[in-house]
Amino acid sequence: MGIAFRLRQLRWGRTAATRVERFETIHWDTPDFRLASWDAGLRYRRGRGWRVTLTDWPEGPGCRRTYVDLEGGPSSPPAEALRLLSPYLRYAEVGQVARLRHLETGRQFGELWAIHQVVSLLVERHAVAHARRVSLRSHGPLTGTRPALAALRKAGVVDTTELPLLAELLGPEAAPRWRGTPLDRDSSVAQAVTAALRDNAARLVRNEAIVLEGSDPEGVHQARVACRRYRSALQTFAPVLEPAWTAELRDELGTLGTDLGAVRDTEVLLTRLRASAAARGVEGEATERLLSRLVGERVLARDVLISVVESHEHGELLQRLLAAASHPALLPETAGQPASDVLLPLMGASWRKLARRAHRLDDHPGDVDLHQLRIAAKKCRYAVLALVPLLGDGPARIAARLGTLQDTLGDQHDAVVAGNWLQEAVGRATDPEIAFAAGVLYGVERERADAGREAWREPWAALARKKGWGWM
């Protein structure tokens, strides 16, 4: 994690510095700075090899980065680096774009490090431009920052900046181009729809890079969420989009979502059953033997997903999704209209579908009915989230309530899925210990599924109250 700052003058003094480093880096990118446009990076540092930088969606001044260090000489990037960066590069060739000289001094504030950087752009070994920064960094979540921020401001830090070093040194051509687009109440339909689709397309690409890196299972989850949100946005905005264009994109996103879901669903089930087994004291070895089949299914599903994501056809799909997000096929008669006038009724339609489905449920709703209610809640939440950049806190509060309802229904659905899987496992088990473990866990999941049939009513009641809907 990190937060960057501009400096007026840093006054913590040499004796306070606990670390001093001098080094040079060679940065690689495409001629149109495709990596920089995504806040990603590829650099070589003599003596330390190659570093790949992947970032998730920037939220405010901080962003979460994943670094992958690879061995190799300076003449060309390792194949693994290009593989990890393929969602950004989409087969474009990379070359050297900048040589930088770094002078870094660091001071520790508890678990955090404040790094003062003086970075120079070198042309034929001569410094032609300079940038000065302080980065507040942590190896884990960026917490406990208040004392460090106070000390930094006292030392001369003046304000935050989200402009990366390469953009500051090389100019706007190296600036990020896939960040959030600001909207307000006066934004047009074209601006709002484009911003929503770009947001989801960008989240998909960023998280596909995390999927390829492989160490964080959250990458698959977030890529799937981005895929679903993109697809849901196309459905929500369908009345203002060309029908054939929308249908084709939704079909392609549906296929990708299936591949992502095959991995994510097995990961969720594994995590859930292991946690239930630990909570009930089920013997660990028996649990792992029970779950070995599921582990194998996850490995197979991930292998299939990776082969899809690395394919040339998928690279072409990403290009189409990004192009479609940047230039959606809007109906000419609606594109210039005020977004709030047009999109609010579309969100209202999604809400009415959810409300009708909820009101149709009797006192003993079935699992399938609750699953359909969860899907409706999810679609409504995505529609409301599209209004947050336009209307602010009102839709955000409703989206949070919808999220609570969705999570409650999601837990009930996960319990049903887990129970069904365990029931099959009991039927095929020949080992008594495995059968016993499966039976115990089946009982746990059926209890949770039964409880979930009533648990959703409380968040639904909170959501259905008129309070909080004044922005409509």
What are these regions (language model features)?
Residues 1-472:
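Function-determining surface determinants
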